[in-house]
């Protein structure tokens, strides 16, 4: 699976604390090696659309959509915001 990013992802990423950016880079490296590595908690978060999340830390997540052989990451941030995004996505 190829990993790509949307512009929105980088906007969110730029607002993260430095330590979280470091964890995000580490998670990305692990994802490239094995998307289903247990600590990543890579899972589908929408019942009908191919939207997935990955764990960055206990308190941060990234969200992307699978299109063909690619996952396009479009959001990264705090778990509290992640819950709000999932709620919005599940309404669609």
Would you name each region that the model predicts?
Residues 21-23, 32, 43, 55, ...:
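Basic side chains
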Residues 29-54:
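A short, surface-exposed loop/turn module that caps and links secondary-structure elements
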Residues 10, 28-31, 73-75:
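Tryptophan-centered motif/residue detector
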Residues 22-30, 84, 91-92:
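Short, charge- and proline-biased low-complexity linear segments
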Residues 1-27:
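Arg/Lys-rich, positively charged N-terminal/basic patches that mediate binding to nucleic acids
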Residues 4, 56-92:
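Enriched for short, Lys/Arg-rich terminal
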């Amino acid at each position: 699976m190829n990993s790509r990013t949307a512009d929105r992802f980088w906007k969110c990423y730029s607002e993260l604390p430095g330590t979280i950016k470091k964890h995000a880079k580490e998670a990305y490296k692990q994802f490239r090696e094995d998307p289903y590595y247990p600590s990543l908690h890579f899972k589908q978060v929408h019942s009908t659309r191919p939207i997935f999340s990955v764990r960055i830390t206990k308190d941060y997540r990234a969200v992307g959509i699978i299109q063909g052989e690619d996952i396009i990451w479009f959001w990264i941030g705090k778990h509290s915001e992640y819950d709000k995004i999932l709620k919005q996505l599940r309404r669609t």
